[in-house]
UniProtKB/Swiss-Prot annotation:
One Gene Ontology term from the biological process aspect of the record: L-histidine biosynthetic process
Species of origin: Pseudomonas putida (strain ATCC 47054 / DSM 6125 / CFBP 8728 / NCIMB 11950 / KT2440)
Protein name: Imidazole glycerol phosphate synthase subunit HisH
Catalytic reaction list: 5-[(5-phospho-1-deoxy-D-ribulos-1-ylimino)methylamino]-1-(5-phospho-beta-D-ribosyl)imidazole-4-carboxamide + L-glutamine = D-erythro-1-(imidazol-4-yl)glycerol 3-phosphate + 5-amino-1-(5-phospho-beta-D-ribosyl)imidazole-4-carboxamide + L-glutamate + H(+); L-glutamine + H2O = L-glutamate + NH4(+)
Pathways involved: Amino-acid biosynthesis; L-histidine biosynthesis; L-histidine from 5-phospho-alpha-D-ribose 1-diphosphate: step 5/9
Gene responsible for this protein: hisH
Amino acid sequence: MQTVAVIDYGMGNLHSVAKALEHVGAGKVLVTSDASVIREADRVVFPGVGAIRDCMAEIRRLGFDSLVREVSQDRPFLGICVGMQALLEHSEENAGVDCIGLFPGQVRFFGKDLQEEGEHLKVPHMGWNEVSQTIDHPLWHDIPDRARFYFVHSYYINAGKPGQVVGRGHYGVDFAAALADGSRFAVQFHPEKSHTHGLQLLQNFIAWDGRW
């Protein structure tokens, strides 16, 4: 039976992610902060919610910045929400925070005066929104283009390499909704809260061999 490690660094609704993974037949799902268990897992999921400063402080305190670099190289790895943002180089949040740097690019604030065609948009971006599949990827299998996923975020990703952006969203500005590089895949939305399409993405992750 394959094992899926959900990295626990004290920030994130980990059990809802774990339950969704179990629901799609992920095998043995372990919510853990044990580096040895994470290293031995067949697949790794890196969720996160909250302020990036607090997240990165805990990630560094636990040595998970180097661990994430290590385990994401050679097995399927999925970053979710702030777990995705932590994989970028830098975030504007909390007066500026350096992140893990696996994906080039910046995490930027939507702004207090975000508008679309003259209409004021609330920040955070919260609710259902379409994701355009800009590049084909195994994790999009059986998910229609422009399917709707559930988002909750005040900061968005401006990716440094367009070729790594496999999904885009729009909320006042265009932003990277999904990034991919080798065995790494990361999403701004919450697949565990996104009903049919979110569960399909998690099922695709469980079936994925990490090649792209």
